[in-house]
Amino acid sequence: MSYLSIAKHYDDCFKKHGDNNLGVDWPKYEDTLIRHEIMFQLLQGDENVSLLDFGCGLGHFYEFLKSHNHHNFTNYSGLDINESFYQTCKQKFPFLNFYHTDILVNDNIPNFDYIVCNGTFTEKRELSQNEMMEFFTSVLKKLWAKTNKGIAFNVMSKLVDWERDDLFHVSIDELGWFLKNNLSRNFVIRNDYKLYEYTVYVYKK
């Protein structure tokens, strides 16, 4: 099963629900705001930085940044593999830079100070755990080469009473060893925001 099936799933969600949280398969709007805030905290108050929203969907993270006046000190760009998301973002935000590419096929994008991946790795759909892990780690390695300061991403937690077969639950220990061996020992695990997932910040130094 190809990881492209995940992109098709999100395309189906957008066609069914339109430009809202359901269109990117987030069930609760209020939870999306929590996730946006957690992603933004990767910057730790750093200003005048370039930021890539990898798997930007419908540009909702930029809308969050703007509504909180965070956009004034971040040079935002978005990237998505999904053609519908890309075209919608270009129409909504013609003054911003968006990329439509599969980074595992074509990684010809510039470097950014920070990269955030919000919801990019939370669903595996029909992929096996091993297939999703291969996709996940391959993308992280690509992104690590494209960031100057740090990246943030979220995955589903295994510290739950039960797991969903279509979601990507990752052991914190397993992930920690991958990060240490392939990216950096300088990482922070955020498991403090009451959702059944966790967010990881990985810093260059």
Model-derived features: positions:
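N-terminal, positively charged/glycine-rich alpha-helical extensions of SAM-dependent methyltransferases
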Residues: 1-20
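Conserved alpha-helix/loop element of class I SAM-dependent methyltransferases that forms part
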Residues: 30-47, 64
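Class I S-adenosyl-L-methionine
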Residues: 163-205
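Conserved glycine-rich SAM-binding loop
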Residues: 57
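A short SAM/SAH-binding and catalytic strip from SAM-dependent methyltransferases
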Residues: 114-133
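Class I SAM-dependent methyltransferase SAM/SAH-binding core
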Residues: 52, 60-97
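A short acidic, Gly/Pro-enriched loop at the edge of an enzyme's catalytic core
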Residues: 107-114
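Conserved beta-strand signature within the Rossmann-like core of class I S-adenosyl-L-methionine
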Residues: 147-155
